Amino acid sequence: MFLAIIKFQNYGQQVLEAANYIGQGFAVTLDHLNRLPITVQYPYEKKLPSERFRGRIHFEFDKCIACEVCVRVCPINLPVVDWIFLKDVKKKKLKNYSIDFGVCIFCGNCVEYCPTNCLSMTEEYELSSYNRHELNFDQTALGRLPPPASEDVSIQLVLNSRNSFRR
């Protein structure tokens, strides 16, 4: 008889514990109802990248002195620098510069150590393609600047909708 009463008490305690845990979970759910969603509908809405974001590398052909510092500091020796030596002026002349973004790890060492600042990081992050050979950018493709992300219409829509929701 006492065993049955003890089992019934244990069962009652377990029911109260379960109800307490369910209540705690429900409180967390109610707390999150007032918050803004974290996700966006990506192709149609885009988030503004942070200031420290390291996107595609931009290259300025005229500033490059073909010193190959970018190749030496790259962990995977990725940038391909082709140059010829001009004997009359005793200087290197850059012929070709390319980076394969299918292999690049976007560490930013090349940008940081470039003595002439001919390399810079952009806000562009949409580099996907169906053919990996399309990710090999030469100096012409690297020289094209993408439109600033802050001027993108889909980002402006997200920022405006969030500001109107907070008011």
Curated annotation (Swiss-Prot):
Gene3D superfamilies: 3.30.70.3270. One of its GO terms (cellular component) is chloroplast thylakoid membrane. [4Fe-4S] cluster 1 binds at C64, C67, C70, C114. [4Fe-4S] cluster 2 binds at C74, C104, C107, C110. It is found in: Plastid, Chloroplast thylakoid membrane. Binds 2 [4Fe-4S] clusters per subunit. PROSITE patterns: 4FE4S_FER_1 (PS00198), 4FE4S_FER_2 (PS51379). Its cofactor is [4Fe-4S] cluster. Coiled coil: none annotated. It catalyses: a plastoquinone + NADH + (n+1) H(+)(in) = a plastoquinol + NAD(+) + n H(+)(out); a plastoquinone + NADPH + (n+1) H(+)(in) = a plastoquinol + NADP(+) + n H(+)(out). One of its GO terms (molecular function) is NADH dehydrogenase (ubiquinone) activity. Keywords: 4Fe-4S, Chloroplast, Iron, Iron-sulfur, Membrane, Metal-binding, NAD, NADP, Plastid, Plastoquinone, Quinone, Repeat, Thylakoid, Translocase. Transmembrane segments: none annotated. GO terms for biological process: photosynthesis, light reaction. Belongs to the complex I 23 kDa subunit family. NDH is composed of at least 16 different subunits, 5 of which are encoded in the nucleus. NDH shuttles electrons from NAD(P)H:plastoquinone, via FMN and iron-sulfur (Fe-S) centers, to quinones in the photosynthetic chain and possibly in a chloroplast respiratory chain. The immediate electron acceptor for the enzyme in this species is believed to be plastoquinone. Couples the redox reaction to proton translocation, and thus conserves the redox energy in a proton gradient. This is NAD(P)H-quinone oxidoreductase subunit I, chloroplastic. The lineage of its organism: Eukaryota, Viridiplantae, Streptophyta, Embryophyta, Tracheophyta.
